[in-house]
Amino acid sequence: MLLSAKFENIYSFNEETRILFTASKSDQLPLQVSRAEKRDDISVLRMGLIYGANASGKSNIIKCLAIIKEFALNGWSNLKYNYFKMTDEPQERSSIELEFKADNQFFAYGIAFSKGGLLEEWLYKTGSRNDTMIFERKRNGDSWDNTIAPQFLKNEDGQFLKFLIDGTPTKGTFLSEYIKRNGKGIDTIKSARKWFENLNIIFPNTHRTDFPFRVVNDTQFRTGCRSQLGMGNLFYVYWGR
């Protein structure tokens, strides 16, 4: 569940711009809000709709989501994008951060980057009262300053975690490297990474070959489609030769 997204110096976004899907305290439209049930929970909107004039930046929001997903899953791979250029002093440092809910936990994952590659990466566990760092990485010339929350370094996996984050390739992200190298000791990284794996981004030229199989095998997806489309049921029909 996406809670918010922040963009800075990328495409049509100059200064830090944030879009929120969290709910206000208003009770005028109660059916449109999923209210917090626990003290550290967050009330969110059941659905978000982005609208505006042509060329106002709507598509750029989706492009930014696709960029951070690519970073989270595969690291830097010579991604093509444009930083904000309609200024007298253009900067090359861009950043994207998403706040989301996964496995009943709230996270903030962000990256800062330039045309030359990744500059910063961070993952925090967030809540209604405070935020807790899981890890941070900052590029310092040709090296990296890496930090993992102390509680994860105390157990038997701590030494391997330090080795793993220090050995993350310059073009890689720790979020992806942790999974590739079978990292242990920080289950929250697995939850955050899984959220990005399940993040569906559909562009006009996207060919969704998995849709028929999800209709059959994913009960939650099928139920949601039926509810939104007003259909009695959905089936996968195979037309063989």
Language-model-detected regions and their locations in the chain:
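Pre-Walker A-like glycine/lysine-rich segment at the N-terminus of P-loop NTPase domains
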Residues: 2-66
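Short acidic-hydrophobic surface loop/beta-edge motif
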Residues: 5, 98-100, 241
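Glycine-centered tight beta-turn/hairpin loop motif at sheet-sheet or coil-to-beta transitions
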Residues: 12, 102-106, 128
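Short amphipathic alpha-helical segments enriched in hydrophobics
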Residues: 14, 69-72, 233
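A broad, low-specificity signal marking well-ordered, structured residues that form hydrophobic/aromatic
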Residues: 17, 48, 96, 173, ...
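Conserved P-loop NTP-binding catalytic core
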Residues: 34, 41-43, 48-49, 53, ...
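Electropositive, glycine-dotted interaction segments
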Residues: 108-240
